[in-house]
Amino acid sequence: MQPIRARATSADHTAASGPCPALPQSGQASTAAGRAWVFFKRWLANPLQMGSIVPSSDALGSRVAAAVHRSPDGMVLELGAGTGAITAAMIRGGVGPERLIVVEIVPEMAEVLRRTYPGVTVLCGDAWELPQLLGLQAAGRIGSVVCGIPMVLLPLERQQGLIDAIEAVAPGRGFLHYSYCVTSPLSAHKLGLQGKREAWTPANFPPASVWRYTPLAAR
């Protein structure tokens, strides 16, 4: 796949992004403790943007990875990758780094991803602008989408905007979404979606579910 050039934006997942945490020095960001520290400091700066105080667990990551649709030539697009807990799980689960495109709006976290996962295409930008961010190079090549953005915290119109952006780059594919809600984090029918819980794990903090949402028109 040809390198995809990101166009960074000033927009945020929820609102203003708040002050950015300093990136760990030397090799600290490449360790689990270093990545967790970056994540925690970002949570302190903007709790609503993060959705959780700690990165996703290996247990949740393995369930997300198991639910990803695999195809020989399809790319996997991850939105809101944070410091890469789910990214790592998908690689362990057999998704080649060259098939992964991850989007992260926080520059410090995007840099951690680049350092930690060589071979993965890391785009620092706004997931609501996916068509502009990915450009024509990814057209028709996205086979699966994983969303880690805490959509339950967003108003309906913002949720719809993100869903429309996903549909624009991966028509009819839908997306996987992991959430800490007991029930569906999205009002699926209001958003033109069909929702199904794919997995649940109590081994995450907090306990988490993996949902698959597909466009009603695609069923």
Predicted regions and their residues:
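Conserved class I S-adenosyl-L-methionine
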Residues: 73-82
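A short glycine-rich, Lys/Arg-flanked "PGG" loop and its adjoining helix->strand segment in the class I
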Residues: 160-172
